[in-house]
From Swiss-Prot:
Pfam families: ILV_EDD_C (PF24877), ILVD_EDD_N (PF00920). The gene is ilvD. This is Dihydroxy-acid dehydratase. [2Fe-2S] cluster binds at C123, C192. Its EC number is 4.2.1.9. The active site is at S515 (proton acceptor).
Amino acid sequence: MKIQLRSHESTYGRKMAGTRALWKANGMKVEQFNKPIIAIVNSFTQFVPGHAHLHEVGQFVKSEIEKQGCFAAEFNTIAIDDGIAMGHNGMLYSLPSRDLIADSVEYMIQAHKADAMVCISNCDKITPGMLMASMRLNIPTVFVSGGPMEAGNLNGNRLDLIEVMVQSADAFVSDEQVRQVELNACPTCGSCSGMFTANSMNCLNEAIGLALPGNGTIVATHTRRKQLFADAASLIVKNTYKYYEKGNENVLPLSIATRESFLNAMTLDIAMGGSTNTILHLLAIAHEAGVDFTMQDIDTLSRKTPCLCKISPNASKYYIQDVNRAGGIIGILSELHKSKLIDVSAKRVDGLTVAEAIRQFDICSTDVTKEALNKYKSAPGNRFNLVMASQQNDYDTLDTDRMNGCIRSTKYAYSEDGGLAILKGNIAMDGCVVKTAGIDENIFLFSGPAKVFDSQESACRGILEGKIVSGDVVVIIYEGPKGGPGMQEMLYPTSYIKSRHLGKGCALITDGRFSGGTSGLSIGHISPEAAASGNIGLVRNNDIIAINIPERTINVLLSEEELAKRRKEELQRGDAAFTPPNRKRIVPKTLRAYASMVSSADKGAVRII
């Protein structure tokens, strides 16, 4: 059954003559009227290295679409660089920007009645924001990312952005060494080179099914990334005609991003030790899709999914470019499939099922295509380079070692349960999140006295002033979605703990969140948060916090009676109850509006209206 183009409302008939005049002024040719209008939802900005090359990408995708007879029009969303926004009040704006991005995409597509869209994303909040919008709009959509940055290299040792932060805070590292690390940590355009939030989300998009194989792992500088852009352009044209000419709803986001797809994506996330932020984002995307996917699902998956991959920051041996050489995300999905841990009947945007994609793109498959083998041979250029798709280095061989290689089989997994876990207890009744892939197993059982701070800034001062010693549990409260507001990332506190060589001797727990670059015993997303009257707000200095990762528990060792007594005392503060009494932070109207509607992290920090 043929479906009328959405753009028909603004391009057809005598009454739309004025609108057509405006479209002509936008460059639309007469022969393009009554053809699909495909939006290029870009996120180019010169503030973010992961997005600095996307202007050329957008123009290239536009030209590829228009070669096939459609009209393509580009617009940009905002994009915040979490690394640059880190360590000051700019981080308060990062998570809220996810909703602004989703809203802006919805506004532009609905206002101009675009028929389909290609989403060109890359970094932390941009991919989830665009995914949230795609669920709301439910029009033909293809995602393609700008690609990851190459790993840095200093004297033969590979490194990334996190190494700069750690060494710069270490008093035993010379100024010259810090300068050299700074100069070499980020050598190219692209999203930072480890399994941080940006790369985690671009990898998960392959499992959700809205992005093509290689989306998350082919480096931004390689020419095969340009082929991926061309493939995305061709696919969106094909899928647009499938939907509007043939009524095929299988190409729509809500037909692809089903419960099975979210379970697959979360299983992948756990297996590869992705950023804890991905949990926040998957919950929010599922919420927009109307899919029943909760923290309980994540907890269940975390108990049966093995850890197959340890990429920086969880280990220093491998980076995203190494995942590509080992067969990319399809390689990990294939190993999960062999142990029946994912649903391979799930559909993908390219018309394949997950099973069919594995057969064609798994480098260990007997049916693997030549295209796939070439795709995963794409190597870094190993030089300073800010130009997208400008080098053609290839690996001589692929990494098919599933015993000791970058991607392991379930038989040779790093651990039987995976790289992410959900903990619950009397200070996290609705759950909290920990990236177990980045923790030394010797501290899976940990207890110690609480050192409580009511802001990230005060925690950083305390750590740098030597107020934290081995055995302590750093507790940072009032940094959740409401309490911040904005749920800051705690990368600097964790980096400072590492720089003082306390990474294996301390824990950090918070109702805030962590950068994808965080490792160590760092537990975030504590829900309900302090500002939502959560028990985490009742913890005081020197209370004993007990953490048991194998049992998935986190508790303050206080009786229910003591907690009830403290709650009563807190409520006696009236309107000031469950707010930080000593913190001086200016909160503008924009963030106050965000705080008034946002849920706790266990719901994905979504708006509750």
